[in-house]
Amino acid sequence: MIEIEGITKRYDETTVVDNVSMVIEPRTIATIVGTSGSGKTTLLRMINRLVEPTSGVIKLDGADNRSVPGYQLRRSIGYAIQGHGLFPHRTVAQNIATVPLLLGWDRDRIKARVDELMTLYQLDPQAYGPRYPHELSGGQQQRVGVARALAAEPNVLLMDEPFGALDPIIRTKAQEDLLAIQKRFGTTIILVTHDMEEAVHLGDKIAVMDAGKLVQYAKPAEILARPASGFVETLVGASERPFRL
């Protein structure tokens, strides 16, 4: 369980995240949606302390996320970003093995985990493991990025616009892959997106951010049926395609 309690982030006189409180249940997907500058990415990054809050507390399974050093916390939380963030001079297998290696896993355990994840993502380990990121398609790079984020078996996976750079067909496949992987591993996922349709499709609950404030946090059906503000209603109405509940 992730408990966010009164989290605020200010830069000088600018409040980027303003007194946000929410609870994310274990083994669920929470999507955070909002326009550019709404504070959604800053909120996400305060969970793994890439950004330190000005005030408030974030608890992971009851423990304050400041109770361990930041680098140690980040090794226990998966993190996937738009554009995959792969190391260009490391092979696919080496990229996926990054965090398990830092955690001191033995070679056989690392290989087994890399092979498992590559197979789950329909990437043959023998064929794709030795390749470099530039030898992959955009969709394949994205899959490797998520596999790397999951490699150390984290209970929590943070995703910042992970599918934003993909074309619509590949993006749909990536979303379905994520739902299947989440169901298999039971990972708690927090995913930031600017796309309300994606938020509805993937999220067990949706957090809508506007100007640093959490304006609604509810299940997709409730967001669609009873938007809490004109801003939420505008986001719901902005999609040109039907929502899939």
Regions found by a protein language model. Name each.
Residues 153:
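Conserved catalytic motifs of ABC-family nucleotide-binding domains
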Residues 131-136, 140:
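Conserved ABC ATPase signature
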Residues 65-78, 102, 226-227:
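ABC ATPase NBD coupling module
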Residues 217-218, 226:
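ABC ATPase "signature
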Residues 157-160:
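Catalytic Walker B motif of ABC-type/P-loop ATPase nucleotide-binding domains
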Residues 48:
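Helix-to-loop junction immediately C-terminal to a conserved catalytic motif
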